[in-house]
Amino acid sequence: MVSMLTRIRRQIKRVIEPLAKTLAQLKVSANFITMLGLIFAIVYYFEIMRSNTTLGIIFLVFSALMDAIDGEVARVSKTVSPLGSFLDSTLDRIEDILYISAFIFLGFSSYLVAIAVGLSLTISYIRAKAESLGLKMEGRGIIERGERIIFVFVILLLYIIVSKQVSLYLFYLFMLLTAITVIQRFYAVYSLLRK
């Protein structure tokens, strides 16, 4: 089952592609964009830590945008490489840690935040390991990385606009869906490897 975000990504590729082509023509490397995404994620983390949640959200969006563009720039500029893939995957994990662990500064339980980080990383690990074994994992599970970033964005938005309590309820839902995705991916890989 292909996730909703995977389908949306395929549709918005038409929007990202012209921007990626422009950046490629300007000789902006995909690896630079990947690094920029990490820098924005670090700034996001520190802005949340400093209780500048609105500014934090802005940098979260910038970071996520870099993540959406870097691979397309590499493809358009024909600079896809093992190094780029390694950087992208590794820095994505660091960004995931920053995105979610910043919730501690909103007053969320550090234990629950640590579990959420662990679950998120486990989802990514299962995909990476499965794909290293030749299994396709895109679209497996109800909350892929893109959806998790959207959840982080909405949780922060609700924290500002509504209340901490409402954002906390959404965080609990985020944790539940993340745990379900771990189970879904584990089961999918287990089933495929047993055949």
Curated annotation (Swiss-Prot):
- The EC designation for this entry is 2.7.8.39
Which branch of life, at top level? Archaea
Identify the InterPro entries for this entry.
AIP_synthase, archin_ph_syn, CDP-OH_P_trans, CDP-OH_PTrfase_TM_dom, CDP_ALCOHOL_P_TRANSF_CS
Any stretches that span the bilayer, and where are they?
28-48, 54-74, 97-117, 149-169, 170-190
The UniProt annotation places Mg(2+) 2 binding at: 67, 88, 92
Substrates-to-products reaction catalysed: CDP-2,3-bis-O-(phytanyl)-sn-glycerol + 1D-myo-inositol 3-phosphate = saturated 1-archaetidyl-1D-myo-inositol 3-phosphate + CMP + H(+)
Matching PROSITE patterns: CDP_ALCOHOL_P_TRANSF (PS00379)
Active-site residues, record numbering mapped to chain: 92
Q: How does it sit in the membrane?
A: Multi-pass membrane protein
A single Pfam family it belongs to is: CDP-OH_P_transf
Annotated pathway, please?
Lipid metabolism; phospholipid metabolism
Q: How is the cofactor bound?
A: Binds 2 Mg(2+) or Mn(2+) ions per subunit.
Q: Which controlled-vocabulary keywords does the entry list?
A: Cell membrane, Lipid biosynthesis, Lipid metabolism, Magnesium, Manganese, Membrane, Metal-binding, Phospholipid metabolism, Transferase, Transmembrane, Transmembrane helix
The cross-references to Gene3D superfamilies, in alphabetical order and at most eight, read: 1.20.120.1760
Sequence similarity: Belongs to the CDP-alcohol phosphatidyltransferase class-I family.
Name recorded for this polypeptide: Archaetidylinositol phosphate synthase
